[in-house]
Amino acid sequence: SRMLTDPPRIGSMQSLGSSPTGPLVFVSSSPQLSPFLHPPGHHGLPSQSYYLETSSTPLYRSSVVTNQLSASEEKLCITSNRQQSYAAAGSGVRVFEMANETRYCAVCSDFASGYHYGFWSCEGCKAFFKRSIQGHNDYMCPATNQCTMDRNRRKSCQACRLRKCYEVGMVKGGLRKDRGGRVLRKDKRYCGPAGDREKPYGDLEHRTAPPQDGGRNSSSSSLSGGGGWCGPRITMPPEQVLFLLQGAEPPALCSRQKVARPYTEVTMMTLLTSMADKELVHMIAWAKKVPGFQELSLHDQVQLLESSWLEVLMIGLIWRSIHCPGKLIFAQDLILDRSEGDCVEGMAEIFDMLLATVSRFRMLKLKPEEFVCLKAIILLNSGAFSFCSNSVESLHNSSAVESMLDNITDALIHHISHSGASVQQQPRRQVQLLLLLSHIRHMSNKGMEHLYSIKCKNKVPLYDLLLEMLDGHRLQSPGKVAQAGEQTEGPSTTTTTSTGSSIGPMRGSQDTHIRSPGSGVLQYGSPSSDQMPIP
């Protein structure tokens, strides 16, 4: 027999076939092999190479077998050189490149160090989020809760940094979607044919962001209606809900209109309607930041906004006026008292109701966390009631809205339970706060009637967004609304919005306008510059 002390090379593979006629050939194993037959990586060695062995023991093969295989093996090695190189690149090199692919932090756009809390993030944001969820996170933004987060300015505002962490989706215990884990495998369950499979959104109440009704993805594993498997239950912690709601609050506005006092009916209503139109723009931007709101269909978003816009504006007015007894702070430069409402017929009654509600909120010592929860509840709860004719469509995905409403209610209950109140006082305070919402709805109905009367008088020009919201609400019967619409078709009611947008389709009585689901009130989501930092 002939002993080969060195591993064979590609060009010398013919020597394996032309070995002496001895019965055995000794081939020593060595880690130094041909590069295309031994690709770097952790995927093992090619199985088609007969002379490769991973063990350190010598390999003895018959020379007869060697003679039969050498020719075919030589041809295979020569012709498949390029294929083996591609295979090596596909297995080892590609994995190496994927492992070293550059990723950036979802919060500050710095280089990401790994997948932390559900998203790619850097070490700084990972440590910051960990400290925030484990300790106190009652951060306050010194500006308008809209600070820029980048590598250089991420430490300037802790409140906006934590808000950005929540906005990108960082959660405690987050895992990569393309990887398993004991938690995910444990939560996955099979929905039986007689159980949740009959309900397309049977597991929706456990989700933070409900899926869109109009464009559901059938391939998504988070929906239980598309297949038999239900995704893992994802819940948003109450602290995260409260933080997102507080970060979504719009900035303080200014009317920027100088009108001589005493006010007349025209000047008073011009000031109030102009201010309401500006607030509506910011209200739409606020609603888009409510957890889960943008996951709803466009129809449901418009429906909720048109049903609750005046209530949302009123509770904001009440909150701004809570520290000024006897005053209503419509803007930083527009503060009115009860006597100034006498110039408009019926306005003094609405002012009295507003001041009484402000006094009640002041007596209850309303907290900022409670205010943002009540405000979101007003928005989401408005879809459960119908104010007008049967022609108004109901919500497409009412179960998703109910799930969002449950999350907001849980956040309110969580805050009250951690506010230091006794066990007996906690449910009492919850009832006291929720009962005030009926008073706000009553004031909203009064205010809507008053706006319709102003529209019928045709003395004060109404802005397009305010007109669209007013006609979309349709508080009165269709006949009265149609009559009001005919009376307001004069040139004095056709103005431009504060944002410069053209009038959108209205759900009013005007037959020439047809509502389009892709346009309307949601196009006014870009706030104007009529704002100032909150002091």
Curated annotation (Swiss-Prot):
It holds the Pfam family zf-C4. Residues 12-21, 525-535 have a biased composition (Polar residues). It is found in: Nucleus. A zinc finger (NR C4-type) spans 105-125, 141-165. GO terms for biological process: response to estradiol. It comes from the Eukaryota. The keyword Cytoplasm does not apply. Its main location: nucleus. InterPro entries: Est_rcpt/est-rel_rcp, Estr_rcpt, Estr_rcpt_N, NHR-like_dom_sf, Nucl_hrmn_rcpt_lig-bd, Nuclear_hormone_rcpt_NR3, Nuclear_hrmn_rcpt, Znf_hrmn_rcpt. Residues 195-208 have a biased composition (Basic and acidic residues). GO terms for cellular component: nucleus. Residues 237-473 form the NR LBD domain. Residues 1-104 are annotated as: Modulating. Residues 1-21, 187-229, 478-535 are annotated as: Disordered. The keyword Endoplasmic reticulum does not apply. Keywords: DNA-binding, Lipid-binding, Metal-binding, Nucleus, Receptor, Steroid-binding, Transcription, Transcription regulation, Zinc, Zinc-finger. Residues 105-170 bind DNA. Highest expression in brain and liver. Residues 214-223, 492-502 have a biased composition (Low complexity). Binds DNA as a homodimer. Can form a heterodimer with ER-beta. The steroid hormones and their receptors are involved in the regulation of eukaryotic gene expression and affect cellular proliferation and differentiation in target tissues. Belongs to the nuclear hormone receptor family. NR3 subfamily. Composed of three domains: a modulating N-terminal domain, a DNA-binding domain and a C-terminal ligand-binding domain. This is Estrogen receptor.
